[in-house]
């Protein structure tokens, strides 16, 4: 079987709540780290989410 082109990554909240989203990205086309402004239900606000590895 071939190696998959997309890898799973974790988007971790910068509010230090421990909340995260899991998404996929293609490392060949998106070489920089992802950063999104998404909703964190723990603090009930939109905060920045940064990319981290899934362990």
Swiss-Prot record:
Pfam families: Ribosomal_L33 (PF00471)
Top-rank lineage group of the source organism: Bacteria
GO MF entries: structural constituent of ribosome
InterPro entries according to UniProt: Ribosomal_bL33, Ribosomal_bL33_CS, Ribosomal_bL33_sf, Ribosomal_zn-bd
GO cellular component, one term: cytosolic large ribosomal subunit
PROSITE patterns: RIBOSOMAL_L33 (PS00582)
Keyword vocabulary terms for this entry: Ribonucleoprotein, Ribosomal protein
GO terms under biological process: translation
Family membership: Belongs to the bacterial ribosomal protein bL33 family.
NCBIfam families documented for this protein: PRK00595.1, rpmG_bact
HAMAP family for the chain: Ribosomal_bL33
Entry protein name: Large ribosomal subunit protein bL33
Gene for this chain: rpmG
């Amino acid at each position: 079987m071939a190696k998959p082109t997309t890898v799973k990554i974790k988007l971790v909240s910068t509010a230090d709540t421990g909340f995260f989203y899991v998404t996929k990205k293609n490392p060949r086309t998106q070489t920089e780290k992802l950063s999104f402004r998404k909703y964190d239900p723990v603090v009930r606000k939109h905060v920045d989410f940064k990319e981290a590895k899934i362990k």
